[in-house]
Amino acid sequence: MKIDEIKLLYGYNDWADARILAACARVSPEQYAAPDSYGRGGLRATMIHILDNLWQQRITLQGYYQEPLADEAAYDATELHEDAIPTFAGLRERWMTEQREMRAYIDALTDETLNGTIRYVIPGLVREHVVWHILLDVIIHATQHRSEAAALLTAYGQSPGDFELTMFMNERASGKS
């Protein structure tokens, strides 16, 4: 993988995130917070899950989990939860921060570090992965859960539209994104 390729994919991911966030902004606070059996348990829960994965993978890549944390509770304490981000405004603010932080991380990579490995520890396991594999997994994970959020939003009459890479590329080529 090359830096320009991962930057293109993160450009797409940010574009798709903007579409889903714009649709979330159009639902009522009650719809946003409503529990549901679909996705991760509702729109807010699903969106926080996407954000948590972006956050967790970024801090993993930056070395936060190089050594084991004290216990399972210490790992749980690093996760983002609905009670900490109860409103859509809070989610959007944190999302923008995480996108900036991830972009800064990616901008500091070289082709060599992108293709290098990272070792990290999660409860009871030591893992090692290629950096770009983790970065790509963030995008794939977000794609899955954005589609779940999109289904919920569509049920509320607020479809975010399509998330196709070719749409992003066409908009980018025309200067719209």
Name each region found by the language model.
Residues K7-A22, R26-T78, V121-S177:
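Short, contiguous alpha-helical
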Residues M1:
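An N-terminal RHG(E/S)-centered segment typical of histidine phosphatases
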Residues E79-Y120, E128-L152:
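Acidic/histidine-rich alpha-helical segments that form the ligand environment
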